[in-house]
Amino acid sequence: MSASYDSIVDQYMAYANASPTRPVEVRTMLRLAGEVQGKSVLDLACGSGYYGREFLRHGARSAHGVDQSQGMIDFARALSKYRGDEMTFQQHDVMEMPFTGEYDVVLAAYLFNYAASLDELRRMFAAVVPHVKRGGRLVVQTLNPDYRLALGNYAAYGVKVLEDEPWQQGARLCLEFPGSPPALITNYRWERAHYEQAVRVAGFSAASWHEPLLEQADVDSRAEGYWEGYVHNCMSVNLVCER
């Protein structure tokens, strides 16, 4: 996995802090994880530690974040120290995690969309499965196979899609995070069948797809029609993998 956020920590955090979809996304992840009280959580591609921190707030026993960007890990540690929470962090590429240990819940928000090939997608799931307890869950948030740039560039939701081009058996997208200067990131979109095959080969027992849980309160908080693009051409989707 080659993407690095070291040079764009400020732009990414500005996007993340202002993103109108963040509350929807964390609500969805929490709901899909099931009962989290007293559970151990591993937050992969953790960034600032937002998701792991939210799971702690909802009763998780522990949360450990892993990210390949040292800049993100430094920021996450400083934020946890400032807030006084007990989330812990390590800087590692998910493909090369040296530590052992199984967790009740493993979170992967916007991780697998960095797989630049189907082989890399399969290897990423294979690298993650040993860290999921038997009976545990991997909760994934990734690029929606059904999203199409022709139907909207997603700029209203905090990140702008500049390109959406065929790539191998999927698509390659160029995303722009706002800032001065803007930051560009490359992501990859794969079909549901590709994910399901990777999940099965890795050794998970079951997988299910879920749409983000947009609630009426979210709709009421914005101007009429604001969420239309999110509902009908959402860039993200969730996948729950059972072990």
Where in this protein do the model-derived segments appear?
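A short acidic, Gly/Pro-enriched loop at the edge of an enzyme's catalytic core
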Residues: P98-V106
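Conserved class I S-adenosyl-L-methionine
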Residues: M1-V36, Y50, E54
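Nucleotide donor/acceptor-binding cores
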Residues: G38-S40
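A short SAM/SAH-binding and catalytic strip from SAM-dependent methyltransferases
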Residues: V105-D119
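C-terminal lobe and adjacent flexible extensions of AdoMet/dcAdoMet transferase-like proteins
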Residues: A198-R243
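A short glycine-rich, Lys/Arg-flanked "PGG" loop and its adjoining helix->strand segment in the class I
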Residues: R122-R134
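SAM-dependent methyltransferase
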Residues: V139-R200
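Class I SAM-dependent methyltransferase SAM/SAH-binding core
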Residues: L42-L44, S48-E96
